[in-house]
Amino acid sequence: MAEGEDVGWWRSWLQQSYQAVKEKSSEALEFMKRDLTEFTQVVQHDTACTIAATASVVKEKLATEGSSGATEKMKKGLSDFLGVISDTFAPSPDKTIDCDVITLMGTPSGTAEPYDGTKARLYSLQSDPATYCNEPDGPPELFDAWLSQFCLEEKKGEISELLVGSPSIRALYTKMVPAAVSHSEFWHRYFYKVHQLEQEQARRDALKQRAEQSISEEPGWEEEEEELMGISPISPKEAKVPVAKISTFPEGEPGPQSPCEENLVTSVEPPAEVTPSESSESISLVTQIANPATAPEARVLPKDLSQKLLEASLEEQGLAVDVGETGPSPPIHSKPLTPAGHTGGPEPRPPARVETLREEAPTDLRVFELNSDSGKSTPSNNGKKGSSTDISEDWEKDFDLDMTEEEVQMALSKVDASGELEDVEWEDWE
């Protein structure tokens, strides 16, 4: 009996153990199933969220790209429109062909054509909103007068062409009519602006034609100026050049400075009858540079001739004229002397009074001493101390006076017969 109880206890313990293991295993299995289910749900949820987030990001990116493309298109269209306006006012260099002078400009429709100022102004007028919104420029009377002669019905065909061919006019018309202006006001203002533009262009063409005509008819001013320069009179500076006289002083010596060294001139009339011969008996006069335009200076030649003839005649008679170095010399009255070789002849009459002629510049005083034996004249300097033998050779080279006794007597007789001139007449000579 005892063995049967032991077997029963072991059997019950095994059953209890098995039952306990079975329960624990089932609980563990349930936990595992529940964990797997939860893990699967979490994974599925996370995957779905990730997929949804990725899809939304992709959709947003695609939407952004699409909107940016539309923006780019709008920006491109606006830039093209503004480029047309800028090219209308100032064509860019890249639209200019380096072939002759052909400039291309952009039109509102997007094409290019040779540049024309009138068309450029017309395109600018068409794309300007002020053309249609503001009142026309100028006096209202002119606009009313033009409006009375304008018929909008006649412009229907042109209006249709403008709306079809000009995007700028079409856009402005759609935006402004009838919100801002009426249909008639829109087109009245536009066509009046075009009318003013045509008038302005007509004035430009008229001015251009007149300028070209004046240039074609303009005489050759340069040729006329050259002709006038060729026949122009002598300038005042050239006309007032004083008579240049050869100085009797050697080079390096200053000229006379005191008033006593002025020229002594006898008041006689110009000996028009006394003409020097063309042979060896000729008189070499002082070279003078005279201007033919000055009449008073042209008389210097006969005055010098008469002076030299009288001085020669005085020296032939042995006259010695003394001139002091200080103070003006008084009029000299000399006594006639009988020349050598003519002691028995009649005594000649006393010569005329010698007077002082004031000139602008002091000149040298020289008296010719006529040697009756040799027939040659030797100059003597009475305005300087000492004799003039040191410069007589130079004067003989410059002045060669050969006169016969008969010519000297004839000159003296004419001098005595002419009489004495007054001081006023000598001033007139100057």
Curated annotation (Swiss-Prot):
Phosphoprotein keyword on record: yes
InterPro entries in UniProt: BSD_dom, BSD_dom_sf, BSD_domain-containing
Biased composition (Basic and acidic residues): 350-367
Residues modified as Phosphoserine: S92, S166, S387, S388, S418
PROSITE patterns, per the entry: BSD
Region of interest called Disordered, as start-end residue ranges on this chain: 247-298, 319-398
Modification sites for Phosphothreonine: T356
Regions of compositional bias (Polar residues) in chain numbering: 276-291, 371-390
Keywords assigned by UniProt, alphabetized: Phosphoprotein
GO cellular component: cytoplasm
Segments forming domain BSD: 146-198
PANTHER family for the chain: BSD DOMAIN-CONTAINING PROTEIN 1, SYNAPSE-ASSOCIATED PROTEIN
Official protein name in the record: BSD domain-containing protein 1
Organism, scientific name: Homo sapiens (Human)
